[in-house]
């Protein structure tokens, strides 16, 4: 079947790089004499196409009105999973909606849940290609949004040290990432956090406190004005002592059926506060540094900050802009090769790499050997530091790099 019209869908959470996917898709399609249309409101918009009066065509003039340097999506989002819709004829309804507008294929950008819907649509005869998007970075290939989010986390961690140092506070920053710790890990390192707690590592609270006490006290005692702070970056999917994720039970579930992760930062603050309160050395330290006031100021302040949606908003960083453009463009190329139900993984020159979407959306966790390297550099990851004895290999020619 010759493709004449492509619909573009962005789904799930917003982040940096999505406008680059939209633009890359549209610009490549234009080069191939194919029209592109934005299907608004994610999968909700796809389901409701039959009742939609018109779609916005992404002409060269229209796509010139928005920037790939801005996060978010010109196409709009919703968190709707098609398989959760009760209508038994939902896929027939979607096909009728696509037929109404003459749309032959779809480019769909999103994370694991979005990818699972790509599989469903493909299995029902709807040609579609998945452009990976999630700031959580928990897919097998790189996904749009990751680098932009990591940079924003690093910025917030670094900036919060000024208020932390002014008040000699322990600062806890809780960040997104669901059940993978990539953004907390990389953002925490780049922001020079003292401690980084991720779902992949069960927390040893004694080890966290040992590191905090040593670093915090040393930092303040060595300051000529007795000023210092200690920063902890916490992934939202952190597990409690029984190995269960920490949920905000009052928040319910989202439309994909996931419990809303929340409260990890508060949980860490409670654990730290308990240990500070029970430690006689802390009272002595507070007295020696002129901070102690009976009944009023007996332990260092512990504050929790949740930047929340600020880490997915604002500006798209250069890598996400580049990757998003190529992911969108190559999604078109894959469609033109007759492929469907696959995920764009990247390209090298004129070679486009892809994998089956069911493989691409398998959860990818932090490589703990990478964590071990950073433990040698002084970062605490909530466990006893592991040894790091790398194997060294000689190489030649081009090696993998981001640019």
Language model regions located:
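Accessory alpha-helical/coil subdomains and C-terminal extensions
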Residues: 36, 105-110, 116-120, 127-128, ...
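N-terminal phosphate-binding or glycine-rich loops at protein starts, especially the Walker A/P-loop
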Residues: 2-51
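Short glycine/serine/threonine-rich phosphate/pyrophosphate-binding segments
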Residues: 15-25, 46-47, 88-92, 106-119, ...
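Glycine-rich oxoanion-binding loops at beta->alpha junctions
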Residues: 49-106, 113, 144-158
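C-terminal non-catalytic interaction/assembly regions of soluble proteins
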Residues: 248-403
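Short glycine-rich or small-residue beta-strand-to-loop segments that form or flank ligand, phosphate
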Residues: 5-13, 73-78, 104-108, 170-174, ...
């Amino acid at each position: 079947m010759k493709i004449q019209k492509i619909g573009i869908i962005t789904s799930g959470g917003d982040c940096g790089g999505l406008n680059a996917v939209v633009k890359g898709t549209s610009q490549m399609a234009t080069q191939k004499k194919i029209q592109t249309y934005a299907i608004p409101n994610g999968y909700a918009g796809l389901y409701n196409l039959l009742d939609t009066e018109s779609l916005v065509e992404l002409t060269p003039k229209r796509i010139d009105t928005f920037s790939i340097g801005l996060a978010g999506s010109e196409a709009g989002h919703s968190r709707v999973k098609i398989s959760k819709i009760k209508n038994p004829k939902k896929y027939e309804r979607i096909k009728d909606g696509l037929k109404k507008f003459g749309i032959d294929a779809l480019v769909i950008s999103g994370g694991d849940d979005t990818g699972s819907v790509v599989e469903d649509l493909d299995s029902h005869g709807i040609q579609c290609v998945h452009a990976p998007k999630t700031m959580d970075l928990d897919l097998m290939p790189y996904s749009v949004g990751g680098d932009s989010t990591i940079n924003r986390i690093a910025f917030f961690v670094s900036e919060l040290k000024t208020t932390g140092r002014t008040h000699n506070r322990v600062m806890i920053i809780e960040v997104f990432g669901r059940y993978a710790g990539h953004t907390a890990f990389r953002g925490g390192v780049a922001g020079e956090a003292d401690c980084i707690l991720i779902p992949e590592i069960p927390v040893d609270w004694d080890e966290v406190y040992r590191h905090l006490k040593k670093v915090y006290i040393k930092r303040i005692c060595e300051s000529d004005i007795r000023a210092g702070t200690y920063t902890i970056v916490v992934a939202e999917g952190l597990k409690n002592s029984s190995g269960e994720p920490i949920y905000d039970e009052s928040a319910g579930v989202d439309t994909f059926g996931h419990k809303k992760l929340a409260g990890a930062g508060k949980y860490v603050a409670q654990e730290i506060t308990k240990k500070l309160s029970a430690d006689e050395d802390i009272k002595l330290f507070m007295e020696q540094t002129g901070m102690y006031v009976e009944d009023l100021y007996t332990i260092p302040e512990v504050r929790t900050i949740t930047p929340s949606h600020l880490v997915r908003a604002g500006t798209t960083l250069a890598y996400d802009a580049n990757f998003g453009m190529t992911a969108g463009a190559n999604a078109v190329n894959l469609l033109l090769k007759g492929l469907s139900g696959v995920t764009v993984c990247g390209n090298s020159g004129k070679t486009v790499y892809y994998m089956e979407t069911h493989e691409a959306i398998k959860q990818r966790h932090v490589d703990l050997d990478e964590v071990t390297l950073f433990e040698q550099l002084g970062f605490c990851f909530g466990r006893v530091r592991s040894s790091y004895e790398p194997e060294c290999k000689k190489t030649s020619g081009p090696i993998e790099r981001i640019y």
